[in-house]
Regions:
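A short, compositionally biased
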Residues: 1, 75-81, 173-177, 206-207
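Solvent-exposed edge beta-strands and adjacent loop segments
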Residues: 1-51, 89-101
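Short beta-strand and beta-hairpin "edge-sheet" elements
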Residues: 23-24, 83-127
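Oligomerization/assembly interface segments of phage tail-like spikes and tubes
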Residues: 33-64, 107-121, 248
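Solvent-exposed loop and beta-edge segments used for protein-protein assembly and interaction
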Residues: 48-50, 76, 105-109, 160-164, ...
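Short, acidic/charged, Gly/Pro-enriched secondary-structure junctions
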Residues: 59-100, 249
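Charged, amphipathic alpha-helical segments and their flanking helix caps
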Residues: 69-76, 124-125, 129-136
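Intrinsically disordered, low-complexity segments enriched in serine, threonine, and glycine
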Residues: 130-273
Length: 273
């Protein structure tokens, strides 16, 4: 395991846990997972993943130990989880709920950290973007995007490289009316009018899904009730349906631009040497 950081969502500050005054070694406790289940006479039922606690040993210089403790405690007090990131891509929301010293040295301390891992799985972001296949003078959005658009129209493919369905953030860019896309046979639709420069964002990566309408200045309001949810999960027209593993065919009208941000799932960060 390499390059581990703890980032405070409250203060937007990060502390390296990989040698910059704090060292967790291989972080063995982070490389574990456990399914909850119940046993019946001839079956296993209710298999699921959920929040859990792990223990990690760390050596820290005095100043870094103090900084990590203060940051983690402030996050916990604010009920604002921090973010663990491994190798710059695998993420897990967490709280450091206990920190104890087993040994002290001249300039540092040996720590035991108890970490509450909140997300069901570790996740990494994979972004796919699609635009209309025609334009007269190029795309000129009133705000910048953190990615480049690929020119595709009407159909395409989305790749979820993990082995499990992925939660996602789907964004429709105006102008469009009642925009929808079909990914892997499921239709994602919001019945709203989206003006030029505005966007509608379906987000089902958190504990509760949201659907927001933003104007060109970033001001937003909820349009959750306008998201189509016919048949519920697996019903074929459910706005919060996780994107299947592997390759999924995509279709849409081709008259508006949109993007899908996959949060690919894995039970543990990948081993790297």
């Amino acid at each position: 395991m390499h390059r581990i950081t703890y980032t405070s969502s409250r203060a937007a500050q990060a502390i390296s846990l990989d040698g910059d005054g704090v060292y967790v070694g291989t972080g063995g406790g982070l490389r574990s997972h456990e399914w909850t289940y119940s046993l019946t006479r001839r079956a296993v039922k209710g298999l699921s993943l959920g929040a859990r606690t792990v223990e990690v040993s760390a050596y820290a210089e005095d100043a870094k130990a103090n900084a990590l403790r203060r940051m983690a405690d402030a996050d916990a007090a604010a009920q604002s989880p921090g973010l663990l990131t491994v190798d710059g891509e695998w993420n897990m929301r967490c709280y450091i709920v206990e920190m104890s010293a087993s040994k002290t040295y001249m300039e540092g301390v040996q720590l035991s950290l108890k970490i509450a891992l909140i997300d069901e799985c570790w996740w990494r972001v994979r972004l796919e973007s699609f635009v209309t296949g025609y334009n007269d003078g190029g795309l000129d959005f009133p705000f910048d995007f953190p990615f480049d658009f690929n020119f595709k129209s009407g159909s395409g493919t989305v790749y979820n490289t993990s082995d499990m369905p992925a939660p996602a953030i789907i964004t429709f860019y105006g102008p469009c009316t009642n925009p929808y896309v079909t990914i892997g046979g499921n239709r994602y639709e919001v019945d709203v009018q989206v003006a030029t420069g505005h966007r509608v964002v379906i987000d089902f990566t958190g504990a509760a899904p949201t659907v927001m309408h933003y104007d060109q200045y970033g001001n937003g309001y909820s349009v959750f009730s306008e998201a189509v949810r016919d048949g519920g999960l697996g019903g074929g027209s459910y706005a919060f349906q996780p994107v299947p593993a592997g390759s999924s065919a995509v279709t849409w009208s081709g008259t508006f631009s949109w993007s899908v941000e996959l949060h690919e799932q894995d039970t543990e960060p990948l081993w790297a040497r």
